[in-house]
UniProtKB/Swiss-Prot annotation:
It comes from Methanothermobacter thermautotrophicus (strain ATCC 29096 / DSM 1053 / JCM 10044 / NBRC 100330 / Delta H) (Methanobacterium thermoautotrophicum). CDD domains: CYCLIN_TFIIB_archaea_like_rpt1 (cd20549), CYCLIN_TFIIB_archaea_like_rpt2 (cd20550). This is Transcription initiation factor IIB. Gene3D superfamilies: 1.10.472.170, Cyclin-like. Belongs to the TFIIB family. GO terms for molecular function: DNA-binding transcription factor activity; TBP-class protein binding; zinc ion binding.
Length: 310
C-alpha cells in the first residue's frame, strides 16, 4: 500500500495507457489516471489529522502538538514552564497549604531552564533582541535570522571583549539586510543603547569572522517604508522606483547613501504627481539632512532631465 502521492506520480505510469498524468483523490483514497480514468490505487492513506477545524480557535483547541521550534528563545522553545496561576489542571484553586511548595518548584524550574554561562548569555541577549525588534517593528523572519547570527557568534566565541548589546544590534542590522527589510545604522543605534560607531564596527567584525555575504542595500528597498510614513500614494512609489532605476542605469547611485537617493527620488515623484511634500518632511522620515536631499535632487533632475525645478 502506498501513502505518498508524489512518490507514485514520480515512479509509476498508467498500466493501461502509459500516461504519467496521475492524480490523487484523498476523499476517495484513490490514485487515478488523468488521461483514461483508470483507478491505479484505492488504498491511499491520508497523512493529515483526523480532526477538522473551521477557524483558528478550533485549530488551537484540537491540535496536540506544541509551538514550533524558534531561535528567538534561548532553549528554542522546547522547555516548559509552571504556570504562575495557583490552579490545577481542572482550573481549581490549589490549597493554601501547597502554595509554598509550588512557589519553590517554580523557582527551581526557572533556575534549571537557564543553567550555565552560555544559557544566561543567550537568555539576556535574545530578550534584548526581542525588545529592539519590537521597537523597530521588525517581522518574525528578521528576528529569527538575527537570533541565528547571534547564536553563531556565541558558538564561535566572538562575544568576548564586546558588549552583548552591541553584538545584538549588529546581528539585527545584518538580519535586516539579509531579509531585505532595510534599517539604517542610526535607527538600530537609537533603539539599542549603543553608538552608531560601535554597531558598525561590530557588524563588520561579525560579517568578516562568520563569512556572511550580504548584497549592498538598494535605494529601492527604502521607498515603500518612506512613502508609507509620508502618506504618499502607490503611484508616487512607482514613479520614485522608476527614477531610482534610471539613476542606477546611469551610475548616479554609486558612492551615494541609499537613504538619500530614495528620499530625493520620492521628493521628485511627489512633485511630479502633485502630492508635494516639503524637503523637511522627507528628510525627517529618511533620517538625512535637507542639504543631502537638495544635492541628490539636483544630480537626478539634471542628469536624468526630469523637468523639475526647485
Amino acid at each position: 500500500m502506498r501513502s505518498d502521492v508524489s512518490e507514485i506520480e514520480k515512479e509509476t505510469k498508467c498500466p493501461e495507457c502509459g500516461s504519467d498524468d496521475l492524480r490523487g483523490d484523498y476523499e476517495r483514497a484513490e490514485i487515478v489516471c488523468g488521461k483514461c480514468g483508470l483507478v491505479i490505487d484505492d488504498n491511499l492513506v491520508d497523512m493529515g489529522p483526523e480532526w477538522r477545524a473551521f477557524d483558528h480557535e478550533q485549530r488551537d483547541k484540537r491540535t496536540r502538538v506544541g509551538a514550533p521550534i524558534t531561535y528567538t528563545i534561548h532553549d528554542k522553545g522546547l522547555s516548559t514552564m509552571i504556570d504562575w496561576r495557583n490552579k490545577d489542571i481542572y482550573g481549581r484553586d490549589i490549597p493554601a497549604r501547597n502554595r509554598a511548595q509550588w512557589y519553590r518548584l517554580r523557582k527551581w524550574q526557572r533556575k534549571i531552564r537557564i543553567s550555565g554561562a552560555t544559557e544566561r548569555n543567550l537568555a539576556f541577549a535574545l530578550s534584548e533582541l526581542d525588545r529592539d525588534s519590537s521597537r523597530l517593528g521588525l517581522p518574525r523572519s528578521v528576528r529569527e535570522a538575527a537570533s541565528m547570527v547571534y547564536r553563531r557568534a556565541v558558538e564561535n566565541k566572538l562575544i568576548r571583549g564586546r558588549s552583548i548589546e552591541g553584538v545584538v544590534a549588529a546581528s539585527l542590522y545584518a538580519a535586516c539586510r539579509k531579509c531585505n527589510v532595510p534599517r539604517t545604522l542610526d535607527e538600530i543605534a537609537e533603539v539599542s543603547r549603543v553608538s552608531k560607531k560601535e554597531v558598525g564596527r561590530t557588524y563588520r567584525f561579525l560579517t568578516r569572522e562568520l563569512n556572511i555575504k550580504l548584497p549592498p542595500t538598494s535605494p529601492v528597498d527604502y521607498v515603500p517604508r518612506f512613502a508609507s510614513e509620508l502618506g504618499l500614494s502607490g503611484e508616487v512609489q512607482s514613479k520614485a522606483i522608476e527614477i531610482i532605476e534610471m539613476a542606477m542605469e546611469n551610475g548616479l547611485t554609486s558612492g551615494r547613501g541609499p537613504t538619500g537617493v530614495a528620499a530625493a527620488a520620492l521628493y521628485i515623484a511627489s512633485v511630479l504627481l502633485g502630492e508635494h511634500k516639503t524637503q523637511r518632511d522627507v528628510a525627517e522620515v529618511a533620517g538625512v539632512t535637507e542639504v543631502t536631499i537638495r544635492n541628490r535632487y539636483k544630480e537626478l533632475t539634471e542628469q536624468l532631465d526630469l523637468g523639475v525645478t526647485l
